[in-house]
């Protein structure tokens, strides 16, 4: 699957699926069962839209990103097409919660019987935005680059990881 939000605030586009509530887990369980009945496998792609979003597509929730920079272009909503709003820059102490959203969604995927999880890290969505000097103007960018190259980001996102210290490492 593609473009599945790990939290309500992670939704970007209209009518995209999530995998973070019990009802969503049950829905994905039905999908996984149908795929497995045909001897197939299914992997969910977790995508937190970050700044590539509009509040109208997520019940008024504000968009968040590493820095307060609007994405270029427009977002289609049920009310029409609008420029992307400027997202709220997350505070350093919120980063661990964003990581935990991905971990929770991965656990939900396991509970739903899905065969794997992929984290979407491109197109200036949240993960990509944190890793790019064009969209992350925060002072700790060098720390994130080091974490990426050492594999620590993947370790922090892994369910059951004992090495999820994003708040400590980025603070």
Give short role names for the model-derived ranges.
Residues 1-49, 98, 106:
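N-terminal capping/small domains of soluble enzymes
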Residues 12-16, 132-142:
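Short glycine/proline- and charge-enriched loop/turn segments
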Residues 14-22, 87-96, 144-147:
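The substrate-binding groove and active-site-proximal loops of carbohydrate-active enzymes
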Residues 33-42, 113-115, 165-169:
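Short, well-ordered coil/turn segments that N-cap beta-strands
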Residues 34, 101-108, 116, 160:
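Structural preference for long, well-ordered alpha-helical segments within the folded cores
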Residues 41, 47-108, 112:
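Non-globular sequence segments
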């Amino acid at each position: 699957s593609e473009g599945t939000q790990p939290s309500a605030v992670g939704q970007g586009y209209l009518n995209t699926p999530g995998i973070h509530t019990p009802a969503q887990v049950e829905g994905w369980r039905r999908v996984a069962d149908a795929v497995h009945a045909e001897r197939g496998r299914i992997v969910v792609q977790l995508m937190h839209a970050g700044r590539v979003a509009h509040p109208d597509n997520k019940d008024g929730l504000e968009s968040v990103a590493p820095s307060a920079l609007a994405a270029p272009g427009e977002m289609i909503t049920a009310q029409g097409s609008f420029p992307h709003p400027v997202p709220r820059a997350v505070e350093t102490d919120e980063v661990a919660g964003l990581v935990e959203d991905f971990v929770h969604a991965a656990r939900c995927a396991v509970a739903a019987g899905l065969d794997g999880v992929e984290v979407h890290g491109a197109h200036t969505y949240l993960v990509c935005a944190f890793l790019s000097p064009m969209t992350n103007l925060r002072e700790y960018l060098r720390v994130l680059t080091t974490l990426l190259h050492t594999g620590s980001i993947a370790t922090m996102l892994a369910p059951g990881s004992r090495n999820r210290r994003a708040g400590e490492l980025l603070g």
